[in-house]
């Protein structure tokens, strides 16, 4: 009799646990902020990997020390945003505006940024390894590139293939 009750209790517990996994959203789920107005928002230190910020206004927002791997910022306004120490590995920042953004020590490895605007951005210590950039943008970045990324150990100028 005790073993039958024990087996039923174990089965019930397993069913409850499986149900919770199917109903409750995990805390690390990617979020969709497409076309939101998030000016001056504070996302610092968060894990936003895989999230979508397409055509989102993030002007003057704090994204420092944030995991932004595989995030899409297509057409987003990141003017004057703080992305210091952010990890943008394999992110899409194509057609985004990063004018006067702080990319100090950011990692952009493998990012797609062909039509991105970087005018006045602080790129000291940023890692641009394998970033897809237009040649004219690359030349402008080389004019101000300096520093070494403390995480990857790569020199900013070398990751941009500066002469």
Where is each model-derived feature located?
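Tandem repeat scaffolds
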Residues: 2-11, 15-163
């Amino acid at each position: 009799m005790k073993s039958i009750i024990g087996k039923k209790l174990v089965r019930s517990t397993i069913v409850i646990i499986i149900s919770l996994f199917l109903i409750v959203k995990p805390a690390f789920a990617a979020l969709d902020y497409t076309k939101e107005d998030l000016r001056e928002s504070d996302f610092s230190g968060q894990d936003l990997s895989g999230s979508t910020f397409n055509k989102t206004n993030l002007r003057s927002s704090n994204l420092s020390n944030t995991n932004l791997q595989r995030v899409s910022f297509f057409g987003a306004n990141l003017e004057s945003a703080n992305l210091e120490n952010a990890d943008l590995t394999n992110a899409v920042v194509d057609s985004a505006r990063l004018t006067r953004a702080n990319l100090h020590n950011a990692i952009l490895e493998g990012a797609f940024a062909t039509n991105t605007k970087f005018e006045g951005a602080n790129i000291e210590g940023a890692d641009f390894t394998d970033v897809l950039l237009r040649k004219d943008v690359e030349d402008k970045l080389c004019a101000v590139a300096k520093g070494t990324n403390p995480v990857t150990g790569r020199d900013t100028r070398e990751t941009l293939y500066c002469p």
